[in-house]
Regions:
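Short, flexible helix-loop junctions that flank or precede catalytic/ligand sites
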Residues: 1-172
Length: 172
């Protein structure tokens, strides 16, 4: 069974919708965009309560998504938020649509960071995930960097060099 709450029709705000979802014991909670501190805070609470929370953030890559969540909170709470994230965050997927060289439809670029038990405890509360997924061990776990995807698309002549430079995260 699917129960959907539409903001403006079924709920006044994301916050009100999330509070109602928590009271109704939903298994999965989908948030189209986490735009304020209250929504982010409730999403973390829902994840801590065992709900699968899927949320969208307007960021350029997976690491930026994590940073945006942490930076929503005041400085004095950021250490605690990093700790909470390290306990509940299963992974982050960031997507971008890149223009194809042939002028056809766009193609997808992804940045994937998956947590595992070794990554989940931040060192002194500073990092939830490693900054890069170029490390071969991380790639074996299913992590994918946007730069690697962009490079592969360029090498396969799907995108041109200007597009590759534009979408590369760490430069060329």
């Amino acid at each position: 069974m699917v129960l959907q709450r539409e903001i403006g029709i079924d709920s006044r705000s994301y916050e009100a919708g999330l509070k109602a979802a928590l009271k109704q014991d939903m298994d999965v909670i989908l948030i189209s965009e986490m735009e304020d501190l209250d929504t982010v805070s409730l999403a973390l609470t829902a994840a801590e309560m065992g709900h699968l929370v899927i949320a969208a953030l307007p960021t350029q890559n997976a690491v930026a998504s994590i940073e945006r969540i942490v930076e929503c909170f005041p400085d004095h709470r950021q250490h605690q938020i990093r700790s909470q994230l390290s306990d509940v965050l299963a992974g982050v997927i960031s997507q971008q649509l890149l223009p194809r060289m042939d002028g056809g439809r766009t193609c997808g670029g992804v940045d994937v960071l998956l947590a595992n038990q070794g990554d989940k405890k931040p060192d002194k509360g500073t990092e939830v995930f490693p900054d890069t997924v170029r490390d071969a061990q991380l790639q074996k776990r299913g992590n994918v960097s946007m730069d690697d995807v962009v490079y592969d698309l360029y090498m396969k002549s799907v995108i041109d060099s200007d597009t590759a430079v534009c979408y590369a995260q760490d430069g060329v």
